[in-house]
């Protein structure tokens, strides 16, 4: 097994990278007080790299830095709250912060502030890890529009699908599509699927998932007349075409298959 903790630890290749990582992590964790910033930075710098990465993921308690001294106005408020830096429990869902697309990677811009720290770990893996540092990056985490991995599905060597969802914006899909199609990875088309914008349809893969080359699970409340758009490069320019066909027919055509099976699941199925 390969764990995220291992990959990040391997990416901290020297003390300079470690300090860069700590500073960026603390800024994104919302540590604004300069004295507290330096105390926590020193705490992390003196830890073994693996232990530091684990602590960053599990959150930093006030008791961890061993001081009850009140150095700022904020120290007098919310004194019962145990954490200085909150844990990152959603790291469990590793398909959201970054997505492998062919031999490239999308380091995603998360929709909610709560989850944005997660992609920092991916940034350092694909910037410094000896094995993965040369991986083509197809989307950067600091883009102003959001995209999450649960909306990105690789359907074949030439086609990917991306959900336009509550968490993934059309502007982000255009950026990703342009980078993917202009790269030498081999993809030729991006299928953008407009799904309902609600928590129960949070990502494309919660309601539509490929389980075989010609079989897909689909939530029964997903209509077959969803708005589907095909994005491709024509004469080096991004071309977007709306399909006036059912999702099933679009998949058959774009994946060059004679038959597509949609397996209803969830709800009363």
Regions found by a protein language model. Give the residues of each.
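The feature marks the mature, well-folded catalytic cores of soluble enzymes
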Residues: 1-269
């Amino acid at each position: 097994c390969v764990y995220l903790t291992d990959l990040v630890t391997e990416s901290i290749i020297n003390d300079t990278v470690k300090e860069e990582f700590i500073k960026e992590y603390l800024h994104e964790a919302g540590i604004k007080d300069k004295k507290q910033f330096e105390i926590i930075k020193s705490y992390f710098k003196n830890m073994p790299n693996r232990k530091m990465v684990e602590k960053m993921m599990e959150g930093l308690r006030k008791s961890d830095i061993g001081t009850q001294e009140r150095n700022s106005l904020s120290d007098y408020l919310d004194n019962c709250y145990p954490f200085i830096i909150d844990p990152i429990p959603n790291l469990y869902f590793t398909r959201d912060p970054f997505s492998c697309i062919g031999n490239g990677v999308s380091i995603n811009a998360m929709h909610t502030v709560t989850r944005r720290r997660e992609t920092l770990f991916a940034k350092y893996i694909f910037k410094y890890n000896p094995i993965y540092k040369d991986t083509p990056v197809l989307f950067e985490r600091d883009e102003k529009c959001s995209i999450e991995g649960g909306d990105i599905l690789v359907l074949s060597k030439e086609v990917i699908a991306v959900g336009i969802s509550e968490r993934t914006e059309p502007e982000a899909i255009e950026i990703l599509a342009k980078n993917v199609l202009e790269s030498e990875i081999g993809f030729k088309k991006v299928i953008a699927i407009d799904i309902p914008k609600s928590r129960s349809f949070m990502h494309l893969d919660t309601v539509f998932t490929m389980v075989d080359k010609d079989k897909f699970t689909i939530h029964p409340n997903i209509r077959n007349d969803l708005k589907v758009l095909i994005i491709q490069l024509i004469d080096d320019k991004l071309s977007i075409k709306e399909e006036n066909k059912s999702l099933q027919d679009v998949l058959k055509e774009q994946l060059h298959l004679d038959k597509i099976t949609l397996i209803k699941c969830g709800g009363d199925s």
